[in-house]
């Protein structure tokens, strides 16, 4: 996912507040979900928070990458972004909370991590719709569902390239004739629906 899109998605989930408030977990929060140095009377503005936000996300991504490498994971860009969003929301944590708990200090497989992400949907012990949506997005990102599609590495793929790709990824048996007819459209549509709606 493009870095700007990634930043914007986290901001969308966090929202923006100029005055300090208590999050569902009871922690004083401000801006785009910042908790460091925030007290009941804290006030901020977008300019200050934009600078903090980008610096913090970049620093956090490096920390997540380093820790996951230490645990022996070889993450894709999308997996790293998903885990960075997760850590931004829940912290790096330890064996009892946050990202470290999610990966079980490196003991979980990539598949197990993917399965566990949606379970972290509570704030103050209550399931929150915003966290359900965020975890679903993080899981999809972690699973690579937002990867940019390339067909045979070509910038201008042909109809035959599309048919070959659809056959490969979906197990379809399209005739490779270069004609985008009803069968090609249906097979492509069905595959897209399966990927994004399971």
What are these regions (language model features)?
Residues 194-198:
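Intrinsically disordered, low-complexity Ser/Thr-rich linker and spacer segments
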Residues 29-31, 82-87, 112-113:
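Structural recognition of the beta-strand scaffold that forms the well-ordered cores
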């Amino acid at each position: 996912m493009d870095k700007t899109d990634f930043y914007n998605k986290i901001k969308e989930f966090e929202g923006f507040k100029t005055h300090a408030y208590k999050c569902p977990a009871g922690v004083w929060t401000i801006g785009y979900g910042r908790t460091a140095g925030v007290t009941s009377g804290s006030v901020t503005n977008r300019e200050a928070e934009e600078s903090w936000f980008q610096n913090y996300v970049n620093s956090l991504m490096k920390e997540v990458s380093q820790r996951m490498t230490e645990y022996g994971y070889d993450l894709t860009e999308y997996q790293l972004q998903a885990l960075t969003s997760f850590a931004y929301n829940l912290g790096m944590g330890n064996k009892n909370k946050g990202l470290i708990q999610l990966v079980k200090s490196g003991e979980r497989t990539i598949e197990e991590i993917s399965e566990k992400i949606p379970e972290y949907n509570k704030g103050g012990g209550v399931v929150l719709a915003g966290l359900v949506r965020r975890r679903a997005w993080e899981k999809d990102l972690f699973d690579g569902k937002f990867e940019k599609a390339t067909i045979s590495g070509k910038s201008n793929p042909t109809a035959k390239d599309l048919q070959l790709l659809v056959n490969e990824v979906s197990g379809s048996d399209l005739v490779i004739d270069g004609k985008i007819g009803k069968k090609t459209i249906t097979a492509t549509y069905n595959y897209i629906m399966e990927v994004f709606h399971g």
